[in-house]
Structures are given as structure tokens and as C-alpha cells.
Amino acid sequence: MERSNAATKCGEEPRSGSRRLPKAEGDKSGSAGAPSKNSSRLGGRPCMCTAGRRPNRASGRRRRSCSPAPTWPPLCCYPQSRPTASAAGPGACMRASGRPHGNTTASTAPPRHPRPRRPGGPALRPTPRPCAGPAPPPASRDCRCRRPRRWPRAGRRGRRAGACKPSCAGAAWSARGAPLCSYRTSCAGSCGARTAPTPAPTCASPSAAASSCCRRRRACSSPTTAWSGACGAGPTAATAAQPGKPRSAAAPGRARA
């Protein structure tokens, strides 16, 4: 009876009237997929039961379904045409072949450590540009921002030769010394207190006018003669008051008749 039951093929319904006996002794080894002694003796193939058929349902016993033979290496280690659920864990592919295959996530990638900064050499540094010089002052029409022009004059050198003379002879402004504006310039000497805001040929005080510092000026016919000083210098009050040296105010150059 046991031989007839063992010879029954897997999946074949038992004949009516025949009673299914409990599992053979060879099937109690614990391995669900291993062939029994009777089946190997009769030359039959091992019985791989499926979950759809339950032959022991009538007897009340539930038999575990046999799982197919596992494949090695796991299926995730090969490129898959379609995504399939693999029973292998995330580390199975690494253990099988030594390196990850297929779909790897950012969590499995090794952490990237930042490289230390290397000091920039002379070739990597930007070319230094020369600093721009001070910007020129904006052009202004105000007279205070403009310096007076220096005109060459015989016997007088220096920055303020045209505006103020060391002997205070030109304490008053000349016609070309202040062409546009009235610059306040003080002279050194006894006439230092005198400032000339306007081109008026006057001195600071009567005592300064009587001294030899300030000279009287008279009107010139042309700016050239006024600049040369031929007609600007006149006799001083002290010189005119000296006895024994008669000088004419109209003709200062004709001292001796």
C-alpha cells in the first residue's frame, strides 16, 4: 500500500475508495524539497507541492507549501529588465560579488570627505590692478576753486609775485592780477594789515601811505604797460616831501632838467 502511494505522481488526485495514509518515514526528515527514500528507489522525480492544491484538506491537516529551490547568486545582482521583488536583503549583492550592482542608493555610497584647501600660488591669484589715483576735482565756475595764473615778470619770482610783492609795492591788485575775481591777499611788511579785496590802488592807513612801502599808482593806457610797471609806480609821499630833490608828479622820470 505504501509503494502504491509513493508511486502516485505529484498533483494526481487519489482514486476513489483509496485511503491516504500518513506521510512516509522518509518525508519526516524536515526538508520540504528533499526527495523521499521510496521515490528515489522507484525512480520518480521529487514532488514539489504548490500552494494552490492542498491534498490533506479533507483530513484536517494543513501542509506547508514547498518553496522553489533558491537561486544563487541572488537575482538582484544581475541587471533586471523589470523590477521584481527580491527576497534577498540589501547586503546580499555585496556579499555575493564584492561590489554593488544594479540600483544603488545614496545611503549605500561611501561618504565623501571634503578635500583640504590648498593655498593658492602666484599663478592662481588674480592679477592685482593698480590703484586709481585721486579723482580730479569737478570743474566749477566758482572763483575760489581756481588758482590765480602766474605771469612772468622781470625781477619778480615766486608764486605770489603777481598778486603780492615782498616790498608791498603791489599791495593793491593790478588790472591783470585779478581778472575775474577779487582774491583777498595780505602782504608782508608794514602793509601786512592791508587786504585788497578790490583792485583799488589804496593803502591801509595814512601812516602806511606816508611810508616808503606803499606807492601810489596811476591809471595806465594799456594792460601791457600796466603789467610792466612803467606807469604804475609813482613817487611816494616820503620822497616827495624831501627837500633838495624836486620831482615832478607828472613826469617822474625827469628828475634832472
UniProtKB/Swiss-Prot annotation:
Q: Where is the composition biased (Pro residues)?
A: 125-139
Tell me the segments the record calls region Disordered.
Answer: 1-164, 225-257
Bias category Basic and acidic residues: which stretches? 10-28
- Residue ranges, compositional bias (Basic residues): 54-65, 144-162
- The highest taxon in the source lineage is Eukaryota
Q: What is this protein called?
A: Uncharacterized protein C10orf95
What broad taxonomic lineage does this protein's source fall under?
Eukaryota, Metazoa, Chordata, Craniata, Vertebrata
